[in-house]
Amino acid sequence: MATEKRSNDLPKAKKPIGKGRTARATNKPVALPANNPTNGKTPAATAKPAKTTSNAKGQLRIRFQLRYRTSFGQTLFITGNHPQLGKGSADQALAMKYFNEESWYAEIDIDTASPAFTYNYLLKSADGSFTTDWGRDKTIDPTTITGKDLLVLDAWNYAGYFENAFYTEPFEQVLLHQRKAAKAISRKTTTHTFHVKAPLLQPHESLCLLGSDALLHDWDTTQPILMEPGAVNGHWSIAFNLNKAQFPIAYKYGIAETATGKFIRFEDGNNRVLYDAVAKDKQTIINDGFAVLPNTSWRGAGIAIPVFSIRTAKGFGVGEFADIPVLVDWAKHVGLKLVQILPVNDTTATHTWMDSYPYAAISAFALHPIYLNLEQVAGKQHKKAYDKLAAQQTALNALDAVDYEAVMKAKLDFVKKIFASEKTVLSSDDFKTYYAQNKHWLLPYAAFCYLRDEYGTCDFNQWPAYRHFNLADIEALAAETSAAYDAIAIHFFIQYHLHLQLQQAVAYAHANGIILKGDIPIGIYRYSVDAWQQPELYHMEYQAGAPPDDFAVKGQNWGFPTYNWAKMQEDGFAWWKQRFEQMRYYFDAFRIDHILGFFRIWSIPMHAVEGIMGHFVPALPVHINEFNSRGIYFDYHRYTQPFINDQVLWDVFGYDNETAKQYLDYNAFGQYSLKPEFATQRQVENHFAGVEQNDVNAKIKQGLFDLISNVLLFEAKDGKAQQFHFRFGMEGTLSFRYLDDGVKNQLKDLYVDYFFRRQDDFWQQQALQKLPALKRVTNMLICGEDLGLVPACVPDVMRDLGLLSLEIQRMPKDPKRTFFHPNDAPYLSVVTPSTHDMSTIRGWWEEDRSKTQEFYNKELGQWGEAPYYCEGWINKAIVIQHLYSPAMWSIFQLQDILGMSDALRRQDPNAERINVPANPKHYWRYRMHLSVEQLMQEKAFNDEFAGYVKASGR
């Protein structure tokens, strides 16, 4: 199994983020010549500190020394929550001084009674950008230091080190063996304290230390010095009195058996070396970062399923939070360690099935009422009322798919019925605590729901007295003395019970060694609480979407407003930080939907309907001079307006071209333009919404859409006819077809430069302004959905930040490959054969016979003609391929797991698909075709699958 290559060598800066150099690994300690501190391949753990003068009584002088090899133009700073370190502000951080090519240092004098503080190092590059070393474990408590001088020798923690993933909450709290911390180290009689991290030791193993001095047992592996586990899992420490030691000292960490002390192995890489000078009233802390040990040995498997898709025997026609524990029981039985779900935020905008789309939340914080378990809310007091729903519950639960409207109506009607007698819970201390912690979103959300129903629309622009959010007005509306109080407070009630039920499900999962992975949508619904509260945070004049691809040839228009990142940055991304904190209530890990949106977002003007009319924002436009410099005569009208002549009309409409001309004006030279009242796709859509719906009108409507998008360039905002963005897929337009070949070639070169070269550094800078700050807010494990048209800078940024990528076999990121093999996945990644936006393995198998045949022969290594249907053994082979991937996580849709069994799987694979991205009006209603309880009874299948999981090392 591959291991991330690291050594004890100094980290060297790499723009934009520094990472360690690779060194030859060795388990054998290297002998250290007594008087040769710079010998050969033995790197200095620290440069020899300069002499310090005695400090005042009651004062502690701290000298920070960081091992880091900078490049020209780079400088280092210390930032922390102490006043002398800038109180966490990068602008006020303490500048470090260059000591030699291998280290930087800084000094501060503080009161010995000062409270403990945390700190990190900042690297400032020549371009002014900052990179912060990772982690939250650099802490100093002055009250524990007995001397007057403290030397702190630190190692830079590159965010992309694999080990950092094991210090996120899911690993610290659930997935890794928890050790009992040793007593705090006493420094009264010690001079040097060594700290190091090793997260993946086995339960019977401990970290140990040996070195070149007699006090470190002279490399004697029969006498390893066992270290003590720290308060944080995977942290190890040991303290020595090295007053009589002979410096420099070479040393290494290793592994030994805890019970017997038997030495097992040394860490990889070269010796660590400590250069120090003993002095009176001085203590030294050595923070060595990570022990250089295998760091890719932990791998897990999980299941991905929307909550609404979970079917249980006692369900109400839809999966609920209360059903998650039932699924957890099955997942544990087969050896899975993760349950991944889709967004569970409230999407109730219209009270119709259109609200089934889980990525169009009316609140980025509120939970969806559809996941409420009525039996738990009813309790004993309302059991009779609940029992009256039995017939309706049975009927809904028997359905193949979710009846969204019927389920929602039944649940809301029942809650309204019992609310009057149950609302006393709102006076409880527990609710008051919950309300105080969540008021910032809960109060506006509840008022929003009331006003939505009162006015019959969630478009707050149509609420005369409340179109602009005003907190004082909302507090008055929601006051207990208000006539609207009950209609508002019922939403407090629902949210509180949803909160309790989801937390209970999470606690059950954790108790069974399973983590819950959530999903953060990239956008917000246009008429949402968030847009109502803070419209300045969004570009309401744009719609977010995605450019055309094989799955949506016209692109995707999600309808969400795009983010005003500049405005969000003014308060340090406070809204995003609140959003991440809310996720932390319930989830251990989360998937950032469309992480590419943090680099740039596909922005579509409001006058457009199809995604193909968009362009990336931000993006560096093409200046008119660039056309001229390439010898392209710039014809503004020809390039930026729809190109329409008789041949184009025939190509688009065929024999209906004469019918289409009623929407056009004839111009000179055999060309046409759209009439002013049909100049935009939105105008065309509105017109055809009021005419007879038939095939001819549908064809004309789509044809007019195609004419409107038949352009080569879009003028940039405020471009003043000087700056332009290329229309995506320019070569496929009819406008391009009828250009001269010479112009075509020149435009193609400029097009390639625009999309695939000039933007990379710019987009990287955009992402680095956002993602590091947001990642630092939470200690959850973060995965990015990095699919689609991926800029070249994305993999580097995600790797440097330690964000897990998503790797899909049939969607290779290398355009030269037809398929991606799971065995080629990076360690920090999630591999999966399909997602909710795709057909399942079985569905895909039947879509394109030529691709299926190629996959069958090349990826599965089979001879002959591929079976027409994806037989169970084929599905099984694909699942096993993914289980044996080196990726940290292998996650499967339940449909793909069941697809391994010819007996258990659904007959029609197309009925298993959750979403069709090309259809903006898709009904999200997929349900399991058998209950989880039934699945639990399939012993042979479960044992077989569990065997594959175990054999793969997951």
Where are these regions (language model features)?
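Eukaryotic low-complexity, Ser/Thr/Pro- and acidic-rich intrinsically disordered regulatory regions
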Residues: P11-R21, N39, K48, G58-R61, ...
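A short, polar/charged loop/turn motif at coil->beta-strand junctions and beta-hairpin connectors
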Residues: G58, F72, A90, K188, ...
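Aromatic-rich carbohydrate-binding modules that target alpha-glucans
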Residues: R69-S114, K124-I145, L200-P248, A256-V278, ...
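Catalytic cores of glycan-processing enzymes that make or break glycosidic bonds
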Residues: R21, N39-K41, K51, A165-T193, ...
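Residues in well-ordered beta-strands of folded domains
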Residues: Q65, T79, K97, L122, ...
